[in-house]
């Protein structure tokens, strides 16, 4: 968690900037597919700054360096950045955004450089306008300068084999999905859709890969028109069964040829437009609002391209019945694994007085999970955190630099797994000793927020932006809050963080209404820096519900929870719960016992633990 000395790396980067007449250089977190989680070879921001969090942007001028990140990572960034760096806390009053800070450095006609494959076209336009106001200019630098600094030490690009995702789990064939997409393209009168998001490609073709840790995706692009379906992928990644499965319905092309083909398509669209009557609007290619600037430029820019919220993202977010049933099933197995783990951990720490560190514990959890049906791997790096480490929202325990678990302190475990039938993400906060009154109060207020989301009933058209305050209301009444969203979309054996829906104050969460079939996390928290952290997280699925009345004749929605792991009885202060909330807790625990106790018929330790933790409060 401690800082590394970035002085030499920054010095070399500044030499390269000087050679290319670039005064300020931007290093985003994302890869060329705008992935949140990336392969090791794409960890450029981490390499140049030393900050390992999943979100952030580094900016380097000739004399300064800044790292911008959000509230999940303030503590972590403060610990990991050396004295070469300024921390820009996103969302803090009187703190500039990274775009504003960049523009300040560009005053007086300076040039700001960025790899155009690592920034979206819309972000590039907005940034260019911001920089222009200060007299600077934005330049797309085709050769990535951090890669040149990294040199031969940069990890190789992964090239793992791709596998079929069976129809029993996908619930819909890739032919049906492409047919649905073509209907959307027809509605928009578009020439085709150029797809760059990796999870969208995996979902569309019912394929899964292993190129990015914890995310079952593979490096590829795709172009879908009314008559063609082209998949751009290195062919050695495709076993014979995958090629046979795709058959003649999909043309395979080299991954590296996407930009040349995009240029040809763009030129063809332009020529066609020039030759047609001006009264008829030209057909444009659709790209996602999250597609790269370089892809937009290859297609000919705004005259040939329309940027839209991807229709695949919208379709993928509404799970079909097979996917929903898979989510229910995998969360029962995952809940059983977590109960076995927590029972084991308590026994080791309290009864056996075993000395365990945070990584020892998380390794055991992975071992337990791996025994369950359809297990593939973890869905993210487990957060196993004791005491003050639990206050670091996205804490990462390193094997050689982690804490011994203190049975007299709060223990927070945020973990998830990839199963063939679904993706899990569960957080539980426990205490193996005697919690303080403040710890119990904080836990119970967080629990009330979780229940408020879980039991919410709302009209069709309601967004996650509107629901976010439901989870915070009890903390707010005490003058408390948390610096992260309340929930994110979850993929079906895909990325654990999935758009476009979620619960929070992000602009995107105000743009898309929650719909039946959405799978979302419900994870309020509270963190006291240097002391303790609390988070409780369940996965919930949106569904239509019956109401006594139906104002406006709209459908009304609610949620179904699928996470099957007990809450920590010891941390609940029942006097802070209403009768309805107590009933919710008791009903939830009864459901957990009924669905998971069968796994422990020959495991007395876990069965006894589960029985105790699911007793009525």
Curated annotation (Swiss-Prot):
Keyword Manganese: yes
Gene Ontology annotations of biological process type: proteolysis
List of residues binding Mn(2+) 2: 414, 425, 537
Needed cofactors: Mn(2+)
EC numbers, comma separated: 3.4.11.9
Keywords noted in UniProt: Aminopeptidase, Hydrolase, Manganese, Metal-binding, Metalloprotease, Protease
Binding site for Mn(2+) 1: 425, 523, 537
Catalysed reaction, written as an equation: Release of any N-terminal amino acid, including proline, that is linked to proline, even from a dipeptide or tripeptide
Source species: Ajellomyces capsulatus (strain G186AR / H82 / ATCC MYA-2454 / RMSCC 2432) (Darling's disease fungus)
Name of the protein: Probable Xaa-Pro aminopeptidase P
